[in-house]
Amino acid sequence: MSNIYIQEPPTNGKVLLKTTAGDIDIELWSKEAPKACRNFIQLCLEAYYDNTIFHRVVPGFIVQGGDPTGTGTGGESVYGAPFKDEFHSRLRFNRRGLVAMANAGPHDNGSQFFFTLGRADELNNKHTIFGKVTGDTVYNMLRLTEVDIDDEERPRNPHRIKSCEVLFNPFDDIIPREIKKPKKEKAEEEIKKLKPKGTKNFSLLSFGEEAEEEEEEVNRVSQSMKGRSKSSHDLLKDDPHLSSVPAVESEKDDATGDLEDDAEDDSVEHDGSMEEDEKNLMRERIAKRLKKDASANVKSAGDGEKKPASRSEELRKEARQLKRELLAAKQKKESATKAEKGSEEEEAVPDGPVAEYRREKQKYEALRKQQPKKGTSREDQTLALLSQFKSKLTQAITEMPENCAEAEVEDDEGWMSHVLQFEDKTRKVKDASMQDSDTFEIYDPRNPVNKRRREESKKLLREKKERR
């Protein structure tokens, strides 16, 4: 990567984008792409990019934003028209973290820009590169891709630019424009206020006088009961059919309903479903208790709302207690049935592999119950077992006879006294002076012995020639 940075020209200008994925530092090539950098810096100074979304995300390729409409077709430059492309021979799409202008064709640059997520040689000489993401903020840029994307490369929950900050402005002559926001139309509420309210003309009705009297009565009652809950006692005070005693039993009914619901929910959580007879028994006990205390609750209804609340709590506690008792009885019954079934099975199969399997199972279940839980006691037990094994191993080694000629018995403890023995394969040392079938013939003409032999053989040949 070092050769890439050496090839790229030095930057001149810096902007900080504060996004929902984190801050992103962008250094600008204002000398190589002056129009694009001036356009980008001025839009940042004018808060043009604030609250805009990254409307296009292509994993491994680009992340595009800068459109105030969020559609991918909006946005305009500070020049009032699209400006020309600015290509440079030392700026190429050869890595991630580059910032370039988005366009729909040649010389069609506006306000939209994109970040590269990898090498993209197909974009060279098509899009103007004007900056790069620096430092650790490149990882915040990569977080922009961690969103759900639909078939049209649009994120369902897109990240957005919260604000922009120009840290270093190489263009001192930039004057931010005052962007006039369009005046909002009057709200619907104001329009409704301007509309005149309709008046009811009861003279047009055949029963106009009666309707007018009912309307006045309703208005008067609604004004008097404004801000309070309304009931038949408030509206019909002179009705002789209504009782003057508050209906406290309704609260009790609600309490019983809540108790039944709580009991049913808890029973579903613990055991799945309770039997119908158990539910009926619980309902009867709660109903009896409610009947006993109904008169006392009616008398003490005027004392306040704390007593009914406390009473309902007591009823809930009693319901929970009943539920626990029923569950305990049911569990006891199930355990008894299981024990009976197990005894019957044992009697049915007195002997054989099944009985042996059951005995082994009971043995290991008893050992598992004796095993302590995790903690210091479990660690102490493990160390004790290890020391016991070591002592057993040393004892087996010491008790082994020196000359064990008998065949070893294969059992669980036989391996402890086993001795590892290897076949004796000693090799003979080769002696150069000894001739053997395995001796290799080595001839060196520079050896003095070989030289003497050659001279002697030559001498013998000369003597033979002379004799002839």
UniProtKB/Swiss-Prot annotation:
Region (Disordered): 204-382, 427-468
CDD domains the UniProt entry points to: CWC27_CTD, cyclophilin_CeCYP16-like
Keywords, in A-Z order: Acetylation, Coiled coil, Nucleus, Phosphoprotein
All residue ranges annotated as the PPIase cyclophilin-type domain in the record: 11-166
Compartments, record wording: Nucleus
Gene3D superfamilies named in the record: Cyclophilin-like (2.40.100.10)
Similarity comment text for this entry: Belongs to the cyclophilin-type PPIase family.
List of residues that carry N-acetylserine: 2
Keyword Coiled coil: yes
Coiled-coil region(s): 206-229, 309-342
Amino acid composition bias (Acidic residues), ranges on this chain: 256-268
GO terms classed as biological process: protein folding
Gene that encodes it: Cwc27
Protein name: Spliceosome-associated protein CWC27 homolog
Gene Ontology CC terms, in alphabetical order: catalytic step 2 spliceosome; nucleus; U2-type precatalytic spliceosome
Biological role: As part of the spliceosome, plays a role in pre-mRNA splicing. Probable inactive PPIase with no peptidyl-prolyl cis-trans isomerase activity. As a component of the minor spliceosome, involved in the splicing of U12-type introns in pre-mRNAs.
InterPro entries the record matches: Cyclophilin-like_dom_sf, Cyclophilin-type_PPIase_CS, Cyclophilin-type_PPIase_dom, Cyclophilin_A-like
Organism of provenance: Rattus norvegicus
Subunit structure and binding partners: Part of the activated spliceosome B/catalytic step 1 spliceosome, one of the forms of the spliceosome which has a well-formed active site but still cannot catalyze the branching reaction and is composed at least of 52 proteins, the U2, U5 and U6 snRNAs and the pre-mRNA. Recruited during early steps of activated spliceosome B maturation, it is probably one of the first proteins released from this complex as he matures to the spliceosome C complex. Component of the minor spliceosome, which splices U12-type introns.
